[in-house]
Amino acid sequence: SINIKLNSEFVAKYLNDMKEADKYGCENKAPETIVIDYGGANVAKPLHVGHLRSAVIGESVKRIERFMGNKVISDVHLGDWGLQMGLIITELECRKPDLVYFDESYTGEYPEEAPFTISELEEIYPCASAKSKVDEEFKEKAHQATLKLQSGYAPYTAIWKHIMKVSVEDLKKNYGNLNVDFDLWKGESDAQPY
């Protein structure tokens, strides 16, 4: 621990001088462009306290840097790729096998409306994750679904787009309730082309 004694008159004068100064005495001689990646929510899953903490801290840093005159670009950086998507797709097929996404002979356009709600998604992922730990066949099928999605398989890409739309709408609402907003809504999937 650090023990420090401050003269109350000195502190009062210092704070009053700060209050009177432009931007509270903070100077930024050469503004910079700063990218801040915070939030880090996973799609199809509810936010937890760790996401809330990083969102509030990141939002505070963003606002301070903007106040200092820097250009700040904020990115939520979503967890929207990988095995979790394969798990969701595989569990969705178990629950709703008659959806056109699982009919290999289907050649039409995929529906614009998602075949699930955010509440269903938030229940599907933990169920699928638990199932993959005890059911090797299910786990392997999820790995194959992940590979197909990442290879551009149209039916799974359509499901993934639904997952993204439903999840991002919900995340924007929840982050908005915290007065947290992002300039970019990029995710792990944005690195896929590289």
Go through the PLM ranges and name each one.
Residues 1-194:
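NTP-dependent nucleotidyl-transfer catalytic core
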